Amino acid sequence: GGLIIKNSSDITNIHDLKNKKVGIAGGSIDKSWLFFRAFFKKKYGMEATAFFRTSFAAPPLINGLLKTGDLDAGINYWNYNARLESQGFKSILNIEDMLPILGITGDLPLIGYVFKEELLEREYDLVKRFLQATNLSRKILEESDEEWDRIMKLTGARDKEMLITIRESFRKGIPKSEIEILNQNIIKAYDILKDIGGKKLVGEGEHLAEGTIWNAN
């Protein structure tokens, strides 16, 4: 995800957002927004909420308000930004741009699967095969343009141009770092999000609980 504006906007950088209306997808503890707040605090030494006017809404509504001009900018999820980028919008700051400033180098997985440990005891091979299948599916989507054409309706793309922006955004977001780097970055990301989101986000957890990350052998 990231910060998106109209191509015709007079906003060219973060400083131009002062007192502007910025829509945030999700709620106040959405991870993209928390990363943005952490980045803003680290780079500019201030709280983003005191710099521009924020409002929270569902991703489709953020896109709609951007199109009507009721918002000056939006922080939305990658797939919604990709749709806008084929309709006269552009991203000026993405999550991957913020992470190095926050001390995270290499890729950071932002989506994963959650399951109970007891499932591993009962169906270890099934879980392992499921993850293998998702990896193979991702590989197909990374390499095959024809597969994207086949699933176009599933993506919500209205035309070929929108499909291409969704496809390329998806491919750009596939983590390619070694598993050890990914695991380290997940732990670092937890600490960053905890410091900004506080107990409302993580409860009493000071650090990512041991065993949270599971890698199939």
List each model region and its residues.
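Bilobed "Venus flytrap"/periplasmic-binding protein-like clamshell domains
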Residues: G2-S86, D149, N183, I187
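Short coil/loop linkers at secondary-structure junctions
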Residues: T12, M46-A50, K90, A157-R158, ...
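Flexible glycine/proline-enriched surface loops and loop-helix/loop-strand junctions
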Residues: K18-V22, G112, F170-K176
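Short secondary-structure capping/turn micro-motifs that flank functional sites
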Residues: A82-R83, P100-I101, R158, E168, ...
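Secondary-structure end/capping motifs
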Residues: E121-K199
